[in-house]
Amino acid sequence: MTVRLKTLYLDTAVPKLQEQFKYKNAHEIPKVTKVSVNRGLGEASQNAKALERSLEELAVITGQRPVVTRAKKAIAGFKIRQGMPVGVMVTLRGERMYAFLDRLVNLALPRIRDFRGVSPKSFDGRGNYTLGLREQLIFPEVDYDSIDQIRGMDISIITTAKTDEEGRALLKVLGMPFREN
């Protein structure tokens, strides 16, 4: 069973991008390679229960068990010692990546209050896109009553696009709702 967004990419995006950018080789056509979901714990780094809740929430949202990221160096100003947990992250590839992107674009983003589209300026210069979410409640998988605190997350969409223009065209064809400036 192929995911809906993957079939959309193969049937619609590939021919559209090939025509738009005049690619001679099929391997030049940009595609999404991975999606990285990251959440910094901040104050909750001392709280083991908050770490557990974050792990559970990201697992429910992404469908994959997150990895705990740990501090590489001690920073006295932030009361962090080396090896302390500072965040959780998930790297999605393949079918899970397409399923997550589909849910993000079609279910989660439209549920944001006063949503007018995502910023078209959040590209990194190499065709990769990053967006930050302020709350986890926009995902339908998260139960409102089960959360202890509203926490956001960063989502990075890594593509094989060479330029921001190619990356923007790819994500637009896949349904990413960019804001018109």
Curated annotation (Swiss-Prot):
One of its GO terms (cellular component) is ribonucleoprotein complex. Pfam families: Ribosomal_L5, Ribosomal_L5_C. The keyword Oxidoreductase does not apply. Keywords: Ribonucleoprotein, Ribosomal protein, RNA-binding, rRNA-binding, tRNA-binding. The keyword Ribosomal protein applies. NCBIfam families: PRK00010.1. This is Large ribosomal subunit protein uL5. It comes from Acaryochloris marina (strain MBIC 11017).
